[in-house]
């Protein structure tokens, strides 16, 4: 029987943790502050103190061989010659309330390390010391207990005996899973064209010899071939051969998680003996069963019954779920179990994930530096990553590593705090003044065009943007300064220093006044400050600082221009990663931006008959900003020609809501007999579903939907058959020119001379190709794609078209378009 690998912390916390979930403010970032203070204490301990000592030992309980391993915070020999295991804990608990028996898990960790080290070194006795560091006062409290090795071994053996049934359950499951997955058959009678090739690529990547940074694969496969099954099936087969312990299926949006759930359900339906556990992780805000009056999770034991006593009941819930045989733990199943056992569904999903084979969730569970799953990704593991809709990852990753902070947050906090003097009020005023001076500096460097409106600061004084008044602080050299926006390559330390100084008094106030009326506002401020300070610690040559003056406000953004090193580090936590999408063109762009320049990239051709796709372009129309007014009527006429060619459902995609609205108003005025539907901004899940329901099969009347490229209907929407028979794409999808996009352009110009491509052309064309992919979803589908922009005829754009667009026809005018559409539909 193979040894059961068991981290010390997992063993101890699983068996001994008790009590409630309590998310009240504790005054420090546990992950970052705890690690920093550990290093501080370890360094202060001197040369004879061995820090972060890796320990591993073999033990047996209930016939199960265990490998127990972990890192002891410190090991040293005291003046009496006794070996001491030091367990360091950072706490916000007041020093007077820190007790020796405050948390049994703390002693247990030290005792297990003592057992491992004592046997390894042949010791007869040793001490365990708990070192508590109080983060507010810097007080250090130490407690020491004396043990014989026999006592420590007995303690460890007792823990293992308690854990043995869980280990036996998991070992039996892994054996059953291995047999099941190694014999897993493809769940359809035959592969669709392209599916076998894609599955083969993914299988080879997952089963390749492990490397330090993991194997990377980029797969571009046409919409409609069944990509989800084509990547899931081979990855599961790889796990069946022993290549990979868990599979993480990562998506850009919740709506695409259902595709993975459905694929796994199909596998279960085709194989009644399939041994597979899958869990879908959903944001806490969406699954909370007991939100507060404002609809937010209230994770406090006195407010939420699902948080109160959570750790006393969660293992009972886990046992019931793992033994029920279904293996499918989606949002609904977790909610049902949470209600049955009175446990938090969000935390239950996280705890259940350690016992599951497939984990489905958002990108941020792997890539976000704040919310990634530390239980899996703080160190490398035998994980397989499937990254769906990978064309979305560059922008999502940039957002994850960026941060913003506004002067108005300081103003609102001061207002919430009210009158009176305090250390916090002084720190707030200093930070507010620094941002006021920063706003003056920005307005001086980059006055807004035509701005003459007087701006009032918090003291009631007024100044004019761009006035000659000399700011009291100096910003770093500007790389860009125009119309109220300044970009700097260096960090604006003069703004960050007062925010850093604000942290301690803000923490003290939040801890001292948890019931104050201003607590919520100041807690929001605290998190905003921490977010920008964390980003400043990551800040390097891949970032730029953006300062924007708007009225009396100043916005500071630390923008991640190039997320490649951070994405690379995240992917390195696993054995293999397959990043796939219908649109990864050009592949070199995505490999570079996502930190995988040497990765294998494959592009599969469309298996669908070319004659089923009518593909036309009207290059006589220019949608450039300066020609937009002139383009509105020709676009309306072209859309009318498309929608009148055959009764059915159509979509027209635009680069912006404003442009969409202009054309829609003109279209409905001139073609009132054609039914229309407009995508509104900010649609929730219900609004999205209602929009799509209008695209019914076998329509008796024509419906033309107006949507936005890159939005919720421009990708990830499956309207097969006659639910959608045509789409028009207005423009080449270029992002709006902005200071941010210009900084991206400059950055990549300096990197490789392709700044316009990286910042504008390639992201824009990705939106175009995604929108066009809504039309043909199956072998039987037939439909039309109409491109409206003269740039589609330029080689820089045309070379980005997929190979199955070879038959694209460029037409002179709407009259010729009507003729071609009639021929296509045979009417």
Features from the language model and the residues they span:
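A substrate-engagement module of RecA-like helicase motors
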Residues: 178, 185, 243-359, 367, ...
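A contiguous, basic/glycine-rich beta-loop/short-helix subdomain that forms a polymer-engagement track
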Residues: 334-359, 369-376, 505-622, 630-632, ...
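Conserved helicase motor "Helicase C" RecA-like lobe of SF1/SF2 P-loop NTPases
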Residues: 655-680
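Conserved pre-motif I regulatory segment
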Residues: 173-220
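Metal-dependent nuclease catalytic cores that hydrolyze phosphodiester bonds in DNA/RNA
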Residues: 1-78, 108
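Conserved RecA-like P-loop NTPase helicase motor core
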Residues: 619-630, 681-792
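Mg2+/Mn2+-dependent nuclease catalytic core
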Residues: 57-154
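Signature of the SF2 helicase/ATPase Hel1-core->accessory helical subdomain module
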Residues: 231, 237, 258, 339-358, ...
């Amino acid at each position: 029987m193979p040894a059961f690998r068991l981290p010390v912390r997992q063993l101890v916390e699983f068996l001994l943790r008790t009590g409630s979930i309590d998310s009240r403010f504790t005054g420090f970032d546990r992950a970052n502050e705890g690690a920093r203070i550990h290093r501080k204490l370890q360094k202060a301990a001197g040369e004879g103190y061995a820090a972060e000592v890796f320990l591993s030992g073999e033990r047996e309980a209930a016939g199960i061989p265990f490998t127990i391993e972990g890192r002891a915070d410190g090991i040293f020999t005291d003046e009496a010659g006794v070996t001491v295991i030091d367990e360091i804990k950072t706490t916000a608990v007041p020093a007077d309330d820190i007790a020796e028996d405050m948390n049994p898990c703390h002693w247990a960790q030290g005792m297990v390390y003592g057992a491992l080290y004592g046997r390894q070194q042949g010791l007869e006795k040793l001490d365990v010391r708990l070192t508590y560091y109080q983060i507010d006062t810097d007080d250090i409290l130490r407690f020491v207990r004396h043990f014989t090795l026999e006592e420590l071994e007995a303690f460890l053996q007792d823990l293992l005996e308690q854990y043995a049934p869980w280990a036996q359950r998991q070992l039996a499951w892994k054996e059953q899973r291995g047999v099941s997955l190694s014999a897993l058959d493809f769940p359809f009678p035959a592969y669709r064209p392209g599916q076998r090739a894609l599955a083969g690529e993914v299988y080879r990547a997952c089963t390749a010899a492990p490397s330090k940074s993991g194997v990377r694969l980029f797969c571009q496969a046409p919409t409609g071939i069944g990509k989800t099954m084509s990547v899931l099936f081979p990855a599961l087969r790889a796990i069946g051969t022993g290549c990979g312990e868990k599979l993480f299926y990562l998506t850009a949006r919740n709506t695409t998680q259902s595709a993975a759930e459905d694929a796994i359900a199909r596998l279960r339906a085709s194989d009644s003996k399939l041994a597979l556990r899958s869990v879908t992780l959903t944001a806490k805000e969406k699954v909370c069963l007991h939100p507060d009056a404002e609809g937010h999770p209230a994770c406090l034991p006195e407010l939420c019954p699902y948080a109160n006593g959570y750790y006393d009941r969660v293992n009972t819930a886990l046992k019931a779920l793992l033994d029920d045989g279904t293996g499918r733990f989606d949002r609904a199943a977790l909610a049902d179990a949470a209600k049955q056992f009175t446990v938090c569904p969000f935390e239950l999903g996280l705890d259940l994930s350690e016992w599951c084979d497939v984990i489905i969730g958002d990108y941020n569970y792997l890539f976000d530096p704040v919310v990634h799953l530390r239980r899996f990704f703080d160190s490398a593991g035998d994980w397989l990553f499937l990254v769906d809709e990978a064309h979305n990852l560059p922008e999502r990753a940039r957002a994850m590593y960026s941060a913003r902070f506004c002067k108005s947050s300081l103003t609102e906090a001061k207002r919430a705090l009210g009158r009176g003097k305090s250390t916090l009020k002084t720190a707030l005023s200093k930070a507010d003044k620094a941002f006021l001076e920063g706003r003056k500096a920005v307005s001086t460097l980059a006055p807004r065009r035509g701005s003459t409106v007087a701006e009032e600061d918090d003291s009631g004084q007024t100044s004019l943007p761009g006035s000659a008044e000399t700011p009291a602080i100096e910003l770093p050299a500007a790389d860009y300064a125009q119309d109220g926006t300044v970009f700097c390559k260096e960090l604006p330390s003069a703004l960050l220093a007062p925010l850093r100084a604000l942290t301690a008094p803000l923490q003290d106030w939040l801890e001292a006044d948890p019931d104050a009326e201003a607590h919520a506002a100041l807690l929001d401020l605290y998190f905003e400050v921490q977010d920008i300070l964390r980003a400043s610690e990551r800040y390097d040559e891949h970032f730029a600082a953006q300062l924007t003056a708007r009225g009396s406000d100043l916005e500071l953004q630390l923008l991640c221009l190039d997320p490649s090193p951070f994405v690379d580090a995240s992917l390195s936590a696993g054995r293999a990663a397959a990043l796939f999408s219908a649109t990864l063109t050009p592949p070199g762009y995505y490999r570079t931006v996502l930190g995988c320049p040497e990765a294998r990239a494959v592009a599969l051709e469309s298996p669908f008959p070319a004659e089923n796709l009518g593909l036309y372009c009207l290059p006589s129309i220019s949608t450039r900003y300066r020609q937009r007014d002139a383009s509105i009527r020709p676009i309306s006429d072209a859309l009318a020609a498309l929608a009148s060619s055959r009764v059915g459902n159509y979509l027209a995609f635009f680069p912006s809501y404003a442009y969409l609205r202009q054309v829609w108003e003109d279209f409905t005025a001139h073609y009132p007999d054609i039914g229309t539907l407009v995508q509104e901004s900010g649609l929730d899940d219900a609004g999205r579903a209602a929009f799509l329901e209008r695209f019914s099969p076998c329509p008796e009347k024509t419906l033309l939907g107006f949507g936005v490229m890159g939005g919720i209907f421009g990708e990830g929407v499956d309207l097969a058959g006659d639910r959608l028979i045509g789409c028009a794409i207005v423009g080449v999808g270029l992002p709006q020119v902005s200071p941010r996009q210009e900084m991206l352009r400059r950055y990549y110009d300096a990197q490789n001379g392709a700044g316009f491509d990286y910042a504008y052309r390639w992201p824009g064309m990705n939106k175009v190709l995604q929108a066009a992919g809504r039309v043909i979803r199956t072998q039987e589908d037939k439909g039309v794609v109409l491109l409206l922009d003269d740039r589609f005829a330029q080689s820089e754009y045309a070379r980005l078209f997929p190979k199955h667009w070879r038959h694209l026809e460029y037409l002179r005018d709407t009259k010729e378009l009507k003729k071609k559409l009639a021929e296509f539909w045979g009417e």
